[in-house]
Amino acid sequence: MSLVAIGINHKTATVDLREKVAFGPDKIHDAMKSLAASTQSGEAVIISTCNRTELYCNNCEAADVVAWLEDYHQLSHEDVEPCLYQYKGQEAVKHLMRVSAGLDSLILGEPQILGQVKQSFVKAKEAGTVAATMDRMFQNTFSVAKKIRTETEIGAAAVSVAFAAVSMAKHIFSSISTTQVLLVGAGETIELVARHLKDNGVTTMVVANRTISRAEAMCEEFGATAITLEQIPDFLPKADIVISSTASPLPILGKGMVEKALKQRRHQPMLLVDIAVPRDIEAEVADLDDAFLYTVDDLQSIIEQNMASRREAAEQAELIAEDQAYQFMEWIRSLESVDSIREYRTKSMAIKDELVERAVNKLAQGGNSEQVLLELANKLTNKLIHAPTQALTAASRQGDLNSLGQLRALLGLDKD
């Protein structure tokens, strides 16, 4: 019985199976209560994202957690078991730390997973399925993830196209927060770009999209202005940065349109990042003096360099996770020793109280005080050395020199 981590992720299971074992936000509260009750662990946390579902329990058997997962989702053992991974004790703690630091993510070092783990922990506390051990484990994990972020370069370099596009803009403009940005498209990539821009303090964004309703929906979240593709020529002269990602088969921004905008800008430089395939911006735009055009290929080379940098940082991060997981288990073991010491002291005090009470009664009945005290001392000594004497005798008879040596050290028999 120990800390247990059971899970599947993007490396072990298909999207189809990951969907089947996922826990929706509306169900995860009751699911954690059910898991804690069914496995009799009392402590349970479920992490469920698009790329992974993981179950963490304390004081339970891994087989019981697997059985609960299969029963909850009505899946056969044959379907689930080949895709599962499981960790126990220190390895379970280390795995949680690796996951939270982004070391086990699809994109190495991505920061979003830490927020998702924190949300899962909060929900578990709300469900009442977290006690002292797992509370300490998760709080330590959050500190370790922060330590890894600050002491390594795991998250310093961009490894997504969206993040790389914004990072490039930050290198070109000394103060990106004061720039005006035109985003062309309203898909997932542009939405991620908008989020990175907002995180970097950009407040003036315009989103151009073929379907205005989709652009408007996105703009609500980021406080941006929505326009149609036909309105781009009117807004382009104001844009310091243009980032485009649509599914258009033909270019949306031509050389003539950009050249006209640059004239209206009185040749203030404009950064254009085309992350669409096929291209949204005509290649000839790069020939314009004040236009700086970068394509997805330019970004990809940056991403490849940065990924190599992250892999180096990950080696440092792994050592931190290993060390911190060991330290956490040291704390767990110290709790076990505290319980043992408390139990030993309680038992010894009970023996003492019983013998003292007998001695007091004998003295009250007129017994010889010297004889009563001597009898008390002898009986107390015999009671306290009984268990160690039995252990020493058993070790000696069995020829267990290792245990015999440990017992002698424990009893202080080898001290000068």
Curated annotation (Swiss-Prot):
Name under which the protein is recorded: Glutamyl-tRNA reductase
The enzyme's E.C. designation: 1.2.1.70
Species this chain originates from: Shewanella pealeana (strain ATCC 700345 / ANG-SQ1)
GO BP, one annotated term: protoporphyrinogen IX biosynthetic process from glutamate
Sequence positions that bind substrate: 49-52, 105, 110-112, 116
Record's keyword terms, sorted: NADP, Oxidoreductase, Porphyrin biosynthesis
Taxonomy of the source species: Bacteria, Pseudomonadati, Pseudomonadota, Gammaproteobacteria, Alteromonadales
The keyword Oxidoreductase appears for this protein: yes
Family matches, as Gene3D superfamilies: Glutamyl-tRNA reductase, N-terminal domain (3.30.460.30), NAD(P)-binding Rossmann-like Domain (3.40.50.720)
Family: Belongs to the glutamyl-tRNA reductase family.
